[in-house]
Amino acid sequence: MIEVPDYIYERSVIKQLYLKEESRHLFQKNAYSVSISGGKEDAQFFAEASAVLTFKENPILKEEDLNDILRKLMCAGGSLEEMRVEIVFKGGFIESELRQFSSSLKQVADWLGAQIIRVSVNLCDTGEREQTVFILGSGAIKSASEAPWKRGKLYAGQDIILTGSLGKYGMTKLFSENIEELRAIYPEPYIEKLKNKRADRLPIIETDTAAFYKTTAMVPLGPGGLLAGLWSLGDREKTGLMVYADRLSYEQETIELCNHFNLNPLMLDSKGAYLLATDMGEELVYALRNAGLRAVCIGRATEDKKRVIVFDDEERFIESPKYSY
């Protein structure tokens, strides 16, 4: 793998980012530069999150491509302030594609209010033609009064709140990957309804609301669904969990597709849904619902180490994650 020449880097990265002259020294192709952002003067800790994207052609960055980074930072009590980016061109290099990428990176950074600290470009002649983008986002963690969930603590007796819809993201993936099969089963109005489903959602309402209701943890769900999220939360804090299946929130289409493909909705990718731990479950649920968000108290943390989901009179243990989609 080789680096892109300086003259290409200058015209297809630097110029596309419209960098001021005093900012150009921040860019290094071989190593991370020192951040000059620093966040708030009293900030002592930073949160970091990364994402890897792959493009087969036209590597144009969109705002939603950074959602995984944004949600992790928000759930850690931070916000995106700085971005460090590396793009690797495999199987061939077209300079116009680098220009397009740099321009789109600038637009996304401006939209998010983030500072681009580093852009590294590398070329690899071997392999199938594609572009791989590595993005590292970071930002100062807010104070405990602004983001009390930043420590990610869970205490016995606390309520566990679920926001969003379980398995919705995995359901939309199932639909897009099996649309022709589903057309033969479901009527066209149903298919059109599924086409318009949008699952990925950032915890904007949660972070705007949670600080007022003694929220001590906020966990983004994703691959492995609810079971993976519950396991991670309980295992990290060595706390038991009692969750009630009849309180869980799904959309009807999620249940129908899980039945068709014989999948467990509790394990379906639930990106866009979140778990919150709070001392004020009823009040937090009420506030979130008033803000237009689907929210429900699904259970509580317990003193013993047992982690179970209650189905009628049967308790099923929450096991170490295995995920689908």
Predicted segment positions?
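Helix-biased detector of long, well-ordered alpha-helical tracts
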Residues: 1-325
